[in-house]
Amino acid sequence: MNYIQQAYKGQRELWMFILTTVLVAGIFILNFVFYLFSEPGDLDAAYDMMKNWPKNFNLIVNLGLFVPLLGFLFVMVKFIHQRSILSLTTARPKVDYKRILFSFLMVCTFTIVTFSIGYYMDSSELIFQFNASKFALLFLISIILFPFQIGLEEYLFRGYLMQHIGVLVKNKWFPLIVTSVLFGIAHSANPEIGAIGFWKMMIFYVGTGLLLGIMTLMDDGLELALGFHLGNNLLASLLVTADWTALQTDAIFKSTADPSLSMLSEILLPVLIVYPIMLLILAKRYGWKNWMDRLFGKITEPQKEDYKIIE
């Protein structure tokens, strides 16, 4: 059974899918509605209000919401859909933590190396603001709460929605596209949208969603996506901050670069060059084959003897 077929191990009534999606994804839905119907001045006022909060308190408030939501998603899967969390995580007999670690180290290594090269070549738009006590608290908050934040996003978009939409439409490409677009829309209230532009940031968010979705389908599990997402977000919190980003933190550096000029380096380069290279690295390491079938193949219900619904 492939990753999407894991949904057959549980109850799949449509009302269960709708109820779980609405209840768990409510925070993302409200974010999008707020962005859609708010005046630009209201958005700016909301961002300015949050900037006045202590940075670590702001981070705790933003990330703390994901803790109960991830737990609630697990409860709905376990007791409403009556299937295991393992089936939501991977098609393997057990979670492969080495895969999580590898993708985590891959994105961290790339980010730190490229940042170091850029800093060595031109540091004029970066302010070194390291404060040991503030950074120690930031590090503690980040390593505790970011796993819940990225966990909810991965288990919801690449996990729950990918599996259940795939079972509904009987293919793989449609849930890959839909969950990637929804992943982008879920971030539409981020302040980066106002600083850089809606469509520019959608290229990045949807492109990142596609990367994580391709990882999940090709590898039959969330492990690589979980590691990548965690490494990316941790470094976004700890390494560099800026006045216009969603994460206002006591990071090691602060960027003063004009965000409107970041189309090439921050959006097109990662999506069109870096992401494909990372997929090739993972494909080589894990022996991915049959790309067409894994990304565009049909979904069929397995024989009953291949699985059982948890009572």
Report residues per predicted region.
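Residue-level signature of transmembrane alpha-helical entry/exit and packing/kink sites
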Residues: 12-20, 54, 58-62, 66, ...
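N-terminal, membrane-interfacial amphipathic/helix-forming hydrophobic leader that caps
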Residues: 1-84, 251-311
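Membrane-helix interface motif
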Residues: 30-45, 116-123, 242-246
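Transmembrane helix-loop-helix hairpins at the membrane interface
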Residues: 139-306, 310
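Juxtamembrane helix-loop-helix connectors linking adjacent transmembrane helices
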Residues: 46-56, 60, 85-152, 162, ...
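Juxtamembrane/disordered regions of integral membrane proteins
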Residues: 2-6, 87, 119-127, 186, ...
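Hydrophobic alpha-helical membrane-insertion segments
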Residues: 19-32, 65, 106, 110, ...
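Hydrophobic alpha-helical transmembrane segments of multi-pass integral membrane proteins
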Residues: 65-76, 104-115, 177-181
